[in-house]
Curated annotation (Swiss-Prot):
Gene: pdf1
Signal peptide residue numbers: 1-24
Catalytic activity: S-hexadecanoyl-L-cysteinyl-[protein] + H2O = L-cysteinyl-[protein] + hexadecanoate + H(+); a di-trans,poly-cis-dolichyl diphosphate + H2O = a di-trans,poly-cis-dolichyl phosphate + phosphate + H(+)
Residues of the site described as Crucial for post-translational processing: 373
CC annotations in GO: endoplasmic reticulum; endoplasmic reticulum membrane; vacuole
Enzyme class, first EC level, given as a word: hydrolase
Protein name (database record): Palmitoyl-protein thioesterase-dolichyl pyrophosphate phosphatase fusion 1
Gene Ontology BP, a term: membrane lipid biosynthetic process
EC number(s) from the headed UniProt entry: 3.1.2.22, 3.6.1.43
């Protein structure tokens, strides 16, 4: 719901916890993935993986990816981790100078004997861009084949985090970018700024950007020819794109293309500047560069397709059948995505409940609306992609069943968005239910600035923390939304709307129990609780019935929010008992705005104020 705000909160939060040692060059390590299979004696070339933004080598998804690659290739697998721990690694994805990070990784690769004879490389999201940078600049990085999944090779023209339809978020981000993106400090410390590119300020981009302009040969520099020659040393460069990528903008960047920033039209790789400047034309003519497109969103692909890529480009000795072939054939659509074992287990629980008829039956895979797209040549499809024909057949549905055109859809965007068919009253009503958190947010702001009660500010602060937790969990699990929703954006687990309502319900009920315990069992209180839970039911149901989320994402979102809400009531109470709130009220800014903390300490506050007002009017009339 607050994807843009969450990104900014995470950015600022990183600086609050940033230790002084982080101003030095971070320590970068290569973590070797070890399994109980022939991992050391094999002559198979190893694979090096560089993860994407907000991820770590030990996350659920990356762990499964690494283990899967190792089982398929029967060789060693290394994962690049930046920093001393997982938090440092996540932070390094946002903050740091890329040239320094790449130099350190290059040195470590050079010191790793098992990589001296060459290796394969797999880059997820921005990790693919960094691996290509290694291939072009690091002599020790003898990469044979490089696969990049959703990597912004041509750059990005906005910070990741805004949905395509969230106009307010986009306006805020573009304003921030316009004010400071070209500043030397930003260019040397913010990772995404170092591959930010816009043709609307192309002169400033060429003048101030020192990473992407050199990497893509958009300016003349000392290593211009070397960049081209080093790319030619690759046996294969495979750029995988996702048709509905909602993280990389423009999404065509993942296939070495761009977008006409005036008309919005796609600029194909062959018509873009990199085709000549980076020598991509020669790679295409030599059969070394392949661009592949999948129909999902960012990093959404079937395990069978992923396995096929690994076997085709990373396997030294081709085998007719692998030990994973049977296990990767999908039984339902959910299990085929790039998801973690934990989320798969959650989905399995819901499958069990569906089998017990406790929930409505899930939609069949063949009912999901996916666009047909050829990703390999016909002669290769049977051999390399054994499940493609099944996938295409399942996705070849009538256009009439798909979403209506953008002109026939109405939408509202206030920190969030929803779509509905104008002639469908049911979906319109459900869409309005999705706006309940926004309405509550407006009420928060209104009460804060009219009542000026510290308790309201603390509750609102808890919602901000709740949103941050939602963002961290989403980027860690990377669980997708339903594939048949055209405009749902970002990852889906857990639902932020449901988590918001879970926090709101828990906080309001627990607050009553803590500060109004003598009244919390009255009929009036039960009526209030029923309203909170009814509103929560409306919101959660709308997110599921409108196909913005799977049922698991809604249920777990509400549970997480409810838990955070209970904890936040306890935490605020603890701060009061320790005198922290009293200290806060003594601060000059809070005194200037007359912030007070009276609600928890006075019962029937509204009735008392009403009586005082009535008494004052009577005295004035007399």
């Amino acid at each position: 719901m607050l994807s843009c705000s969450s990104f900014l909160i995470f950015f600022l939060f990183s600086w609050v916890l940033l230790p002084m040692k982080s101003f030095a060059i971070p320590i970068i390590s290569l973590d070797k993935v070890r399994l109980a299979i022939n991992d050391g004696a094999s002559e198979q070339l190893p694979v090096v993986i560089w993860h994407g933004l907000g991820d770590t080598p030990t996350s659920f998804t990356l762990t499964e990816v690494s283990q899967r690659v190792q089982k398929l290739t029967k060789g060693a697998v290394y994962a690049i981790r930046v920093g001393d721990n997982e938090f440092e690694d996540i932070k390094a994805g946002y903050l740091g100078k890329l040239e320094d990070q790449l130099d350190e990784v290059c040195d470590l690769i050079g010191n790793e004997d098992s990589l001296s004879n060459g290796f394969y490389a797999l880059g997820l999201s921005q990790g693919g861009l960094f691996l290509r940078a290694l291939a072009q600049t690091c002599d020790a990085a003898k990469i044979r084949s490089l696969i990049t999944l959703g990597s912004p090779h041509s750059g990005i023209n906005t910070i990741p985090g805004c949905s395509p339809t969230n106009l307010i978020c986009k306006a805020v981000v573009h304003s921030i970018l316009g004010l400071g993106i070209w500043h030397s400090w930003i260019q040397n410390h913010v990772v995404q700024a170092q591959y930010y590119r816009t043709e609307k300020q192309y002169d400033k981009y060429l003048e101030n950007n020192k990473f992407l302009t050199h990497l893509n040969n958009e300016v003349l520099h000392d290593n211009y020819t070397r960049n081209i020659e080093k790319l030619k040393e690759l046996d294969n460069l495979v750029a995988v794109s996702f048709e509905r990528d909602d993280i990389v903008e423009p999404p065509y960047s993942t296939g070495f293309g761009w977008i006409n920033e005036t008309t919005g039209e796609n600029i194909e790789m062959e018509d873009f500047v990199l085709y000549e400047s980076l020598g991509l034309k020669d790679l295409v003519n030599q059969g070394k560069l392949e661009t592949i497109s999948f129909p999902g969103r960012h990093l959404q692909m079937r395990w069978g397709d992923f396995d096929a890529l690994v076997l085709k480009y990373f396997k030294d000795e081709k085998e007719e059948k692998t030990e994973l072939e049977e296990s990767t054939r999908p039984s339902n659509f959910l299990s085929t995505y790039f998801v973690s074992p934990l989320v798969s287990a959650i989905d399995g629980t819901v499958d069990y409940l569906h089998g017990k008829s406790l929930f409505p039956e899930k939609r069949n895979f063949k009912e999901l609306t996916m666009r047909k797209r050829s990703i390999v040549t016909p002669e290769d499809s049977e051999e390399v992609y054994p499940y493609i024909s099944e996938f295409v057949a399942a996705s070849n549905v009538s256009e009439e069943k798909g979403p209506k055109s953008f002109a026939n859809l109405a939408f509202i965007t206030i920190f969030s968005h929803f779509f509905y068919h104008i002639d469908d009253m049911w979906r319109s009503t459900l869409g309005l239910f999705s706006l309940i958190p926004q309405i509550i947010g407006i009420i928060y702001l209104t009460v804060m600035f009219t009542g000026r009660e510290l308790d309201t500010f603390m509750q609102f602060g808890g919602q901000v923390v709740n949103e941050f937790i939602n963002y961290v969990v989403k980027v860690s699990l990377k669980y997708p939304r339903p594939a048949d929703i055209e405009y749902g954006v970002g990852y889906g687990m857990p639902s932020s709307h449901s988590q918001f309502m879970g926090f709101f319900s828990a906080y309001m009920i627990a607050w009553d129990y803590k500060y109004r315990r003598s009244q919390c069992f009255s009929m009036l209180s039960f009526a209030k609780y029923a309203i909170y839970l009814t509103l929560s039911t409306f919101v959660c149901s709308s997110r599921y019935l409108l196909d913005f989320h799977y049922l698991t994402q809604v249920v777990y979102g509400y549970m997480i929010g409810f838990g955070v809400g209970l904890f936040w009531v306890y935490l605020v109470g603890k701060l009061r008992s320790l005198g922290v709130t009293k200290w806060l009220l003594s601060l000059p800014p809070l005194q200037f705005f007359y912030i007070k903390d009276t609600i928890p300490h006075s019962k029937d506050n509204h009735k008392r104020q009403w009586l005082e007002s009535k008494q004052f009017k009577n005295q004035k009339s007399n």
